[in-house]
Amino acid sequence: MDKRSFKVIVVGGSIAGLTLAHSLDLAGIDYIVLEKHSDPLATVGGSVGLLPNGWRILHQLGLRHQLEQEACPVKVAHMTYPDGFVFSDNFPAAIQERQVPEIQFPIGYMPANDERFGYSLSVLTRQQLIEVLYLGLRDKSKIKVGQRVIKIQHHQNRRGVSVFTESGQEHVGDLVAGADGVHSITRSQMWLQLGQKLDAEKERRQLVAEYSCVFGISSPLKGIPPGEQLIACHDNATVLAFPGKDAHIGWGLIQKLNRPCNSPATTQSSDGETALIMAKSAAGLGLCKDLKFHDLWVNTPKYSFTILEEGLFQIWHHGRIMTPNMAQGANTAIEGAAALANTLRRISQIDKPSEDDINRLLQGYTVRQQKRLRAVHAISRSVTRVHARQGRIKKIIGRYVYPYTPGAALHTFSRIIAPAPCLDYVPMPFPGPGWTRALVSGWSPISGVLLLVIPIIALVYGYSVINFGRDSINN
């Protein structure tokens, strides 16, 4: 099949959607992106963190240099505790740099000089990342703004699918890829078409919320300089702070809900009153020496509130509709887009692909990505609960185990990141030996990860799992 005769309709101009657009363009596949906002650069969300798995794909897309102008590399991470104890770890620098000291790892193997990935752990705003992705597109006319999708319909007597928008337009393509967040119209339409084959209510219940979050960007504060990450752990609450290059601080206040909830009606809130109540209750929480949450709050002109949902949908595709789980943070959104592009390229290479061809290849994608995301999902749950000191065991692990296992973060982080997918039809950069080691030794995302993974990843995925923006929450 001529790749340009195969057309993909991407729903959502999110981080995932724009990454997929770049990837399809490099594959020679025709596409359009339907974005509901009238401005493709609409300011939505707070800070995001780029990890090596996200960096590598963006490097393949030719965007590394532009992003390095915007992103602030993190060199050290600080964790603070209610008793005043502070633990600092320079593993963020060690992930990129070549000088890693020999360390005796108390639970076994800890390689010292083969786990760096050549990319920094970096912080930037979601707005900056979206701008780099959008402005880097070769053909911006393919981004259709003001196109809120209301219906997706498979063609009965011919190949393809139609997407209808609120403005009355119909867009025709061969396959629809949803990159429109957790509360996705693409997913809803897929569930509707599955009908009795799917217990939609059971699938919706895959998302459960136990925590809420207020997030924003504060003006600079003395004591939280660029290049440093701060995680303040308190009972049932956590404050995360990530200064950018301009010293403005992306932050998030995460608090445990009184009871879990999974109703969509209660999980799409932007309730300013609730945010104010949360902020007032947390005003006295210590961040670091001489700084409290109140100092961040009074220096933040704009903030948002959301419920943090956790879960992994089981059904990702039906017919010519694909809704990968692209809502686990910027890095897994980027991963998912690249892995989906690999699959769509294979479909486009088939002469007149049948429904069976499409289903077979999309199912293969689903199985591979679900296996990886199950590990990420398990880690993300643990991260939130260790940070919030939920229960005696997690308090002990976070306060008394993690700080005394030097090198553990570097080792475990490497095992999580190294097997990450990237574009398989674009030259693969190997800027650090960690990537090569993964291919040679066959690391898996969870091999060798014992109880220590909980506090270890608490620092690492403080950036990635809780990205305070549209890709990690909703569209």
Curated annotation (Swiss-Prot):
Q: What is this protein called?
A: FAD-dependent monooxygenase sdgC
Check the record and name the Pfam families matching this protein: FAD_binding_3
Kindly give the membrane topology term recorded for this protein.
Answer: Single-pass membrane protein
* Any one GO CC term of the record: membrane
Q: Which residues cross the membrane?
A: 446-466
Tell me the residue numbers annotated for binding FAD. Answer: E35, G49, R126, A330
The answer to whether keyword Signal applies is yes
One of the entry's Gene Ontology molecular-function terms is: FAD binding
Q: Which organism is it from?
A: Emericella nidulans (strain FGSC A4 / ATCC 38163 / CBS 112.46 / NRRL 194 / M139) (Aspergillus nidulans)
Q: Tell me which EC number(s) this protein carries.
A: 1.-.-.-
Enzyme class, UniProt record, top EC level: oxidoreductase
In the UniProt record, the signal sequence range is 1-23
| Family affiliation | Belongs to the paxM FAD-dependent monooxygenase family.
Which pathway does this chain act in? Secondary metabolite biosynthesis
The cofactors named for this UniProt entry are: FAD
The compartments listed are: Membrane
Q: What role does this protein play?
A: FAD-dependent monooxygenase; part of the gene cluster that mediates the biosynthesis of the polyenes aspernidgulenes. The carbon backbone of aspernidgulenes is synthesized by the HR-PKS sdgA, which accepts acetyl-CoA as the starter unit and performs malonyl-CoA extensions as well as regioselective methylation and reduction. The resulting nonaketide offloads the HR-PKS by intramolecular lactonization to yield the 5,6-dihydro-alpha-pyrone-containing hexaenoic acids preaspernidgulene A1 and A2. The FAD-dependent monooxygenase sdgC then installs the first epoxide on the penultimate double bond.
Q: Which residues are glycosylated?
A: N236
- Alphabetized UniProt keyword annotations: FAD, Flavoprotein, Glycoprotein, Membrane, Monooxygenase, Oxidoreductase, Signal, Transmembrane, Transmembrane helix
Q: Which InterPro entries match?
A: FAD-bd, FAD/NAD-bd_sf, FAD_mOase_fung
Q: Which BP terms from GO are recorded?
A: secondary metabolite biosynthetic process
Could you tell me the superkingdom of the organism this chain comes from?
Answer: Eukaryota
